[in-house]
Design a protein with these regions (language model features):
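C-terminal interaction appendages of subunits in large macromolecular complexes
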Residues: 2-5, 9-10, 14, 18-19, ...
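Helix-hairpin-helix/helix-loop-helix acidic hairpins
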Residues: 20-32
């Protein structure tokens, strides 16, 4: 399928730069499309990913936006960092056996369950990957199997998750909460498996290694952007300097002289620049001279030396800043991440609470009951 998309403001900041993007013709040959996007953010870790192929599978859990940026800055500063999953669905997470997302690791995720009163429980969040429908079905199933004892379960979810569980008479709410975690989808176990393609080969990495690769890639992309910017500024400085000399030294008058042919005019202009060539940052080309001669004479006479001087000074200041950024690329990359956090980090605080769960014994919480009513 062919998919077109409009990038968001965030995507324009982190995933799109026409000057550093490799392009190819679209399926019908009418437009260009990116081969890959120059991603300057650990999007794979932020959004998570899951997939399966022949003999391989991957499951990368999502992580918190701000924590990823904090970790990136720590890595750039040579400090230790740790990363733990964070889910938009909230809930609680036991990351004791996370193993930084590598094969063999495991995390437990729980819903938030509140005691509304002695006879009523309210589930305020669902574990990652579980819907309220699945959650309710698992509760009914546990009740049918005699593992919990409830009267009914009701889905009052609107903007926020709210699943109400009405308990049977004489049933302990504390024991029921433990039983819900033990026998229903109020608690699920997830097994991460960070398998990614690196240099055309599948590799099993930790989330720390993934972040390091992303940060190194981002730094390289920023370096490339700075060098492109530097080249553009140098070109502008070169032409502005040529314009100033062309006007200030009255080299344009060569256009008024009678020469045998156009080539002689170009050669005469080039020779007139000889005393000033050492001041320039690159050689004068034929294209430079042609560009100068294409300017209408009336515009040449209107050139303002003071304005050209101001342009050149501004370009020199920008070149100085770009050189400083290239010489201090780590600081520049840190500033890039901090700017992202300032622009987009608000409202992206951690939603999943990190906790260490107590082991629940099945025999201590199983209850024989009657059939519930589901609404």
């Amino acid at each position: 399928r062919y998919i077109e998309a409009r990038p968001s403001k965030f995507a324009l900041d982190v995933a799109f730069n026409p000057k550093t993007t490799e392009w190819q013709l679209s399926y019908d040959g009418r437009k260009n499309e990116p081969v890959t996007l120059p991603m300057k953010f650990p999007l794979l870790l932020a959004q998570g990913a899951e997939g399966i192929a022949v003999g391989l599978s991957t499951k990368i859990l999502p992580h918190n936006f701000n924590e990823l940026i904090d970790a990136a800055v720590k890595y750039l500063r040579g400090k230790r960092f740790e990363l733990y999953p964070d889910f938009q669905t909230g809930g609680m997470l036991d990351s004791t056996d996370y193993e930084q997302g590598k094969r063999g690791g495991r995390v437990k995720v729980r819903a938030h369950i509140e005691e509304l009163d002695k006879k009523t429980l309210v589930i305020r969040s669902v574990p990652y990957g579980v819907t309220t429908t699945q959650l309710m079905e698992s509760i009914v199933k546990a009740n049918d199997q005699g593992k919990i004892k409830i009267k009914k379960v009701t889905d009052n979810t609107a903007a926020a998750v709210e699943v109400q569980v009405d308990l049977a008479t004489g049933v302990s709410s504390d024991i029921t909460i433990d039983a819900l975690y033990k026998f229903t989808d109020c608690e699920v176990s997830l097994s991460p498996n960070a398998c990614v393609i690196v240099e055309q080969r599948p590799q099993f990495l930790s989330v720390q290694e993934l972040l390091k690769q992303s940060v190194d890639h981002t730094k390289d992309l920023l370096d490339n952007e700075l060098r492109i910017r530097q080249a553009e500024l140098l070109e502008k400085w070169h032409y502005s300097s040529l314009e100033k000399i062309f006007f200030e030294e009255k080299i344009y008058k060569e256009l008024e002289k009678k020469h045998e042919d156009w080539e002689k005019v170009i050669k005469a202009i080039d020779s007139a620049f000889d005393p000033f060539k050492k001041k320039l940052k690159r050689a004068i080309t034929r294209e430079d001279i042609l560009k100068l001669t294409e300017k209408p004479v009336r515009r040449i006479y209107r050139l303002d030396i003071a304005e050209l001087d101001a342009q050149i000074k501004q370009l020199e200041a920008e070149l100085k800043q770009v050189k400083h950024d290239l010489d201090n690329l780590v600081d520049y990359t840190v500033a890039y991440y901090e700017n992202l956090q300032k622009k987009y980090g608000k409202g992206r605080e951690r939603k999943t609470e990190l906790k260490q769960f107590e082991v629940i014994q099945a025999k201590q919480v199983a209850i024989v009951n009657a059939e519930p009513y589901v609404k």
